[in-house]
């Protein structure tokens, strides 16, 4: 075929492809939608990528979870471990165990990539929880939950709770000694709920613990119910985020009515793709190189073999720690004794999550601020909120340490009862001390480093014979120093021109322009620069 014929054929194919795309565009308006998607602006601050880490980890969880589902047997039926072929783990040979535990042993030793996939799934779950918690901490300390984003805070908090429950159901499925111990603790907590606990535990477990149908029910919850809730909440969360646009940290050219950063294509897409590859590599690297949850060492669950050293994954440690630190008190109500595990296992988590759900409205009352906000706070500018956050972190940390009291007492040769007593005082005194220290530290930082936008521009800059610049009178930085303000450009009239009006408090034009950036619409700086995007509505 000649070059002319090849060119004609290529043009024909291009024409047919273009015709198909035009037909689709005429019916769905796809080109306009894609243009708006590709022009979406994302902030450049690194902390906004933590949410991306969570979503990338979720993808790893879905991939590995689907693989594991093919080889797992969700049954509590009693079997004898005696594989006819393949690798045999002889310490368990001939022992009675559940069919679920046997399938996990075979998955680990006889299924190709089974061990890597199972451990990667576990590591990805830990990374996912860590990213979600860090993401929520950023939102709390910077005030990103304020109007108009209260609903997204509620969705995010519900997502966190659901993910914790999903993680617990996941590591309970192997039915090994460690997971069985955790399920027995949860059974006791549910059974301790006043008036309805006994019937509720009986119905959920399908009889007395462990309950024959419970593993099958747990499998359905872990594989279908919770994943559907997580995907639904995450989709709703992203839809609201897309509609309301991102918050952003204050800075030059940033206002309540615009957002500056990188366009989704190509800058943000390339950055997100690189981060996703990193998360995938780290997850599978950990799964292939670092052992986690070796269920074959723990053995099958038997109540009489439970021993010290049984701790849940770190994200649930605070709940187990609360159970361990609860004093041996007795409470009676309406002639009935309330079981001790009810208070640390149900009441305390209920109060904690209730306060967290209500926090956007509590914060409004504290600061008497009912306006909409798109710019984030610096933690130092909100001492009370920052103090509460630090107190909460200390509270959860002390409870998490309490889940390892048996190990700590053995390793550091401290009396177990004495260690419990120390942590009981610590869970009360620690948060109070943390709040006071954080509150005072924020106030000190405010006094020592006032925000540039609050400083008046004053003084006259003169040039000496040796070419140096000096400031006469009041200086803009408030220290009375006799030198030019850093970053200012001198002019011939003896006054300094601020490098960025938005930084040092120069007036902003009515159109919302600051530092030469547009506050409305899309303003790009090319593929290699930053862009600004207008919001649908300003603060009220």
Where are these regions (language model features)?
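Membrane-embedded alpha-helical bundles that constitute the cytochrome b-like, heme-associated redox core
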Residues: 2-325, 343-540
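Membrane-interface amphipathic/re-entrant loop segments adjacent to transmembrane helices
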Residues: 325-341
């Amino acid at each position: 075929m000649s070059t002319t014929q090849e060119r004609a054929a290529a043009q024909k194919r291009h024409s047919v492809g273009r015709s198909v795309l035009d037909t689709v565009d005429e019916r769905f308006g796809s080109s306009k939608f894609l243009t708006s998607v590709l022009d979406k602006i994302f902030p450049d601050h690194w902390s906004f990528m933590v949410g991306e880490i969570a979503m990338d980890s979720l993808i790893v969880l879905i991939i590995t979870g689907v693989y594991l589902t093919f080889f797992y047997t969700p049954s509590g039926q009693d079997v004898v471990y005696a594989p006819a072929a393949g690798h045999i783990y002889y310490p368990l040979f001939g022992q009675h165990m559940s069919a679920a535990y046997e399938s996990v042993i075979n998955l680990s030793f006889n299924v190709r990539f089974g061990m890597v996939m199972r451990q990667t799934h576990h590591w990805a779950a830990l990374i996912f929880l860590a990213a979600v918690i860090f993401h929520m901490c950023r939102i709390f300390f910077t005030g990103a939950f304020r109007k108009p984003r209260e609903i997204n805070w509620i969705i995010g908090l519900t997502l966190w709770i659901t993910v914790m429950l999903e993680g617990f159901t996941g590591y309970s499925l192997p039915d090994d000694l460690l997971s069985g111990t955790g399920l027995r603790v949860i059974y006791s907590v549910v059974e301790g709920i006043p008036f309805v606990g006994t019937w509720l535990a009986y119905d959920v477990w399908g009889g007395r613990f462990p309950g024959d149908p419970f593993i099958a029910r747990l499998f359905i919850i872990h594989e279908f119910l919770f994943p559907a809730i997580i995907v639904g909440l995450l989709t709703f969360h992203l839809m609201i985020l897309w509609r309301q646009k991102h918050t952003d940290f204050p800075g030059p050219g940033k206002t309540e009515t615009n957002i500056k950063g990188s366009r989704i294509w190509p800058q943000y897409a390339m950055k997100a793709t690189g981060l996703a590859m990193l998360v995938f590599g780290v997850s599978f690297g950990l799964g292939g190189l670092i052992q986690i949850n070796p269920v074959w060492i723990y053995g099958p669950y038997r109540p009489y073999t439970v021993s010290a050293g049984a701790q849940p994954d770190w994200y649930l440690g605070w709940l187990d720690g609360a159970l361990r630190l609860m004093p041996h008190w007795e409470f009676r109500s309406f002639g009935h004794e309330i079981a001790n595990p009810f208070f640390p296992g149900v009441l305390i988590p209920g109060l904690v999550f209730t306060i967290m759900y209500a926090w956007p409205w509590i914060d409004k009352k504290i600061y008497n601020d009912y306006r909409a906000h798109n710019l984030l706070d610096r933690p130092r500018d909100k001492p009370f909120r920052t103090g509460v956050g630090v107190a909460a972190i200390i509270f959860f940390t002390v409870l998490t340490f309490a889940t390892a009291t048996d190990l700590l007492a053995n390793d550091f040769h401290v009396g177990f009862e004495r260690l419990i007593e120390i942590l009981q005082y610590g869970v009360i005194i620690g948060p109070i001390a943390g709040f006071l220290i954080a509150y005072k530290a924020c106030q000190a930082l405010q006094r020592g480093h006032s925000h540039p936008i609050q400083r008046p521009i004053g003084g006259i800059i003169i040039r000496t014979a040796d070419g140096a610049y000096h400031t006469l009178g009041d200086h803009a930085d408030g220290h009375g120093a006799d030198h030019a303000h850093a970053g200012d450009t001198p002019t011939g009239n003896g006054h300094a021109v601020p490098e960025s009006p938005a930084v040092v408090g120069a007036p902003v034009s009515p159109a919302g322009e600051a530092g030469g950036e547009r506050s409305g619409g899309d303003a790009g700086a090319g593929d290699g620069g930053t862009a600004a995007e207008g919001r649908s509505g300003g603060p009220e």
